[in-house]
């Protein structure tokens, strides 16, 4: 696994931060939204671009995650309705978001300049392939503007989605003690030391850990809105409807994931729903649930990084569970009071800014007992 060494190095860096807090005699409270952002930014920048920005330890590039989050407020609106941009009123509605976008694009420019200072050819990161890729039909390579646009997409996709799912999984485990106890026991029994936790059969055997991650993706999908697609020539039949070419169609992923016809008790965190033979789960019920489960979208436009995201999440959460104990805090309950989603105060609420904007969780960490 070519990226495993990078993942393990960054996981250890994240756990070093958590250990510093966990050993603090004044209390081990930490904002996992911020730590998750810095962690996934560091992983993304090294795996995709071959650059080490070290946001977990160095404050110099932490502004990027904030700028991206601010930029996405405007972008999330325009994805659902491009009219404000057509009328040029978005600059009056979202001045701070546009400033964030400019900061973010400034970082993209600096990233490309940093790469140009040294040769990265053949080092195996994703971007090195993108730079040299050729159209199999015409032999053309991507232009500088196209590479810049791909950069922006890769940074956003590689940072925000995994960050929100990591934070959300820890949130749900901290609020569901039975799930937390079971998954902790599973991981700690599978590995005698956190240094043994690597991608492979032993980690794959932690099926309840995978179920916890999938239940998090169902409850709080990192991209929860409809991803619109235009119907091509000839139109399309969808159920009893015949829709003409040119019509945009989409399914709201959050709504799909909370449809009780596919996911009974949709606002309850129940990892067992993904495991045949657990509780009331049967092969038929699990198959039905998976038919309405699309956190990475589906088809030819589904997320190309799905496999990597699962590796990143399982590896990271396994290390955290093996090394630490953590719990919900009064501060986190206070943070969510008055801003509950449909699932109440025990739902990790995400705001639709293309990817999910979030707060916390604020968790109490201690060294594993």
Swiss-Prot record:
Domain of life of the native organism: Eukaryota
Pathway named in the protein's UniProt entry: Secondary metabolite biosynthesis
GO molecular function: heme binding; iron ion binding; monooxygenase activity; oxidoreductase activity, acting on paired donors, with incorporation or reduction of molecular oxygen
Keyword annotations of the record: Heme, Iron, Metal-binding, Monooxygenase, Oxidoreductase
Biotechnology: Apicidin F, like the other known apicidins, is a cyclic tetrapeptides with anti-malarial properties via histone deacetylase inhibitory activity.
Family (UniProt): Belongs to the cytochrome P450 family.
Listed PROSITE patterns: CYTOCHROME_P450
Role played: Cytochrome P450 monooxygenase; part of the gene cluster that mediates the biosynthesis of the cyclic tetrapeptide apicidin F (APF). The non-ribosomal peptide synthetase apf1 incorporates four different amino acids to produce apicidin F: L-phenylalanine, D-pipecolic acid (D-pip), N-methoxy-L-tryptophan and L-2-aminooctanedioic acid. L-Phenylalanine is the only proteinogenic amino acid directly used by apf1. The 3 other apf1 substrates are non-proteinogenic and have to be modified by other enzymes of the cluster.
InterPro entries: Cyt_P450 (IPR001128), Cyt_P450_CS (IPR017972), Cyt_P450_E_grp-I (IPR002401), Cyt_P450_sf (IPR036396), Cytochrome_P450_monoxygenase (IPR050121)
Keyword Heme listed: yes
Induction behaviour: Expression is positively regulated by the apicidin F cluster-specific transcription factor apf2 that binds to the eight-base-pair motif 5'-TGACGTGA-3' called the 'Api-box' that is found in all promoters of the apicidin F cluster except in the promoter region of apf2 itself.
SUPFAM superfamilies: Cytochrome P450 (SSF48264)
Organism: Gibberella fujikuroi (strain CBS 195.34 / IMI 58289 / NRRL A-6831) (Bakanae and foot rot disease fungus)
Protein name, entry field: Cytochrome P450 monooxygenase apf8
Binding site for heme: 303
Alphabetical list of CDD domains matching this protein: CYP67-like (cd11061)
Cofactor (UniProt): heme
This enzyme's EC code(s): 1.-.-.-
Family annotation (Pfam families): p450
């Amino acid at each position: 696994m070519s990226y495993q060494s990078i993942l393990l190095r960054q996981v250890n860096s994240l756990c070093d931060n958590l250990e510093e807090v966990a050993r603090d005699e004044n209390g081990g409270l930490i904002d996992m939204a911020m730590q998750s952002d810095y962690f996934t930014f560091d992983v993304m920048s090294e795996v995709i671009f071959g650059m080490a920005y070290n946001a977990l330890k160095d404050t110099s590039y932490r502004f990027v995650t904030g700028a991206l989050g601010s930029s996405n407020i405007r972008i999330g609106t325009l994805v659902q309705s491009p009219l404000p941009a057509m009328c040029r009123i978005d600059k009056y509605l979202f001045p701070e978001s546009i400033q964030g976008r400019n900061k973010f694009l400034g970082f993209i420019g600096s990233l490309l300049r940093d790469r140009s200072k040294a040769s990265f050819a053949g080092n195996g990161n994703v971007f090195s392939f993108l730079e040299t890729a050729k159209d199999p039909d015409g032999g053309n390579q991507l232009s500088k503007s196209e590479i810049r646009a791909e950069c922006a997409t890769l940074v956003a996709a590689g940072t925000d989605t995994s960050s929100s799912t990591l934070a959300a999984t820890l949130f749900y485990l901290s609020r569901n003690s039975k799930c937390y106890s079971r998954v902790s026991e599973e991981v700690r029994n599978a590995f005698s030391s956190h240094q043994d936790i690597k991608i492979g059969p032993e980690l794959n055997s932690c099926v309840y850990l995978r179920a916890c991650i999938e239940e998090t993706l169902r409850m709080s999908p990192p991209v929860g809105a409809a991803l619109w697609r235009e119907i091509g020539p000839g139109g399309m039949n969808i159920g009893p409807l015949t829709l003409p070419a040119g019509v945009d169609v989409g399914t709201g992923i959050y709504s799909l994931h909370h449809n009780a016809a596919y996911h009974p008790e949709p606002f309850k965190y129940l990892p067992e729903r993904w495991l045949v033979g657990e509780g009331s789960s049967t092969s038929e019920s699990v198959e039905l649930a998976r038919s309405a489960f699309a956190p990475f979208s589906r088809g030819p436009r589904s997320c190309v990084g799905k496999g990597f995201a699962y590796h990143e999440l399982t590896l990271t959460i396994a290390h955290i569970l093996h090394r630490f104990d953590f719990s919900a805090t009064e501060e986190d309950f206070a943070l969510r009071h008055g801003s509950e989603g449909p699932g109440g105060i025990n739902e990790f609420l995400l705001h639709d800014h293309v990817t999910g904007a979030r707060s916390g969780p604020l968790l109490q960490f201690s060294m594993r007992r």
